């Protein structure tokens, strides 16, 4: 038969199909197996109404056969096969999907039948074979026909169709693998282990058995005796047909069919984790987009979680065929710790089936999965506080980062999952903190730093403790940005005890402080002059009880923010907090400095001012520029 040309933009278009659409050559096997699965689906559907098919569901299978000597890989199915006309139209016209046409012809009611789950949409997957093969031969016999046909093509030069011999209904796709090139070892695809790996990676959950002949070696009794009279064993290697894929994914099973123990075993094997997950989340959604998901909350942080090598995201499947192994769009950033799989027959894939065409579908799934994860974590917090605190210790940073990057109702969703120390041992949520607030407490007090013990001992916290008000210790660098995003919780404003007015003074007390400030103005100006640019201003404090001094800030940049920017390589060096030195007018150190200044001993007053400033820096967790000078100052006053 004369060679035919492809009925499309011919050579140019086929070249694009082969070289431009797919990013990974190894997916050729996924595409050919998916076509075989579709062919079996069609004949299985036919068998529901045609008893002449003569095949039970358990008879269908897909066979993968490598031949190193011939350098071929054959994918054989016993599906519906193709007529000569179908060969010409389906394989001769690029981007025509016979599977999609079949699905359209069924009508909506038939598509809902659980036996039908057509994968193919675009009619280009077959041509991915040319990424690894320099020639492809298709031998097929259609159901209801006694004649088989052979389709042969070496790529863009066209194809031929001739009659062939085939005893059974179905299709054999024979790929003649290319010779090895520099940087591309095509021979690897002829190895059993490589083909099995690709099947398990991309087609593990295709509903039909994918079988291969696998060599198995074992010690058997040879029937002879050794010198000790014991049975003599010999190694025997035999070839057995082995089903490579799992077929029915665990997430497609009901709770009765798949226990939590089985799901946990799946998690450990799938994600290479020796520890049980903290939570198993199952989702079965139907509506605008139907999908199933099986999610897990790990019990510990992956080694690369907070590095640039982190690989968050869920595995994405379309009708059991893996599309992406790390789809980050399926999870809101705050839930990036979750592992698992999502499978949907309704995804609008692009032509290579390597990504989605409409992110609206992903956003819908991600929003729903976010709600499910939030619900599960809330339940865990309520029912198993110890386990939840274990989760929070591992992944609290992820929640906080998500709270900062998300906007609007996402912040409201995340805020109730966060925990903060109010003592060295006690953790509370924002809701628990507000519920426990005394009636006279109007603000949510918090302090930021890297150490709970230091934050609890801040001088600014003493007055609050005396009144029975707890302080939230925020030890993550992200916490301050999170609070700044929220502004308030349950109509209670946040108050940073290092920067904000605590709001505890009465009008009479405020006037008293202002009067003292005016009275000691000359001394306070002297302290400011002594310290120079190290502080922006000096004032008497309304926050201190027994402590002599504290360091506060004004404006939008706090000490924690300054430290954060200081730790970033290449960050601007001019981002600095506006420092304010606050002094306790009732403390004996202040009184001693005041007496020295009044007596004209400005050297002593200056030394005390410098020591107080150094103490304020140390209390705030700031380094001293000259520790030796500080030590010398202390010694002069002893």
Spell out what each predicted region is.
Residues 118, 136-158, 178-638:
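GHKL/Bergerat-fold ATPase module in large chromosome/replication-associated machines
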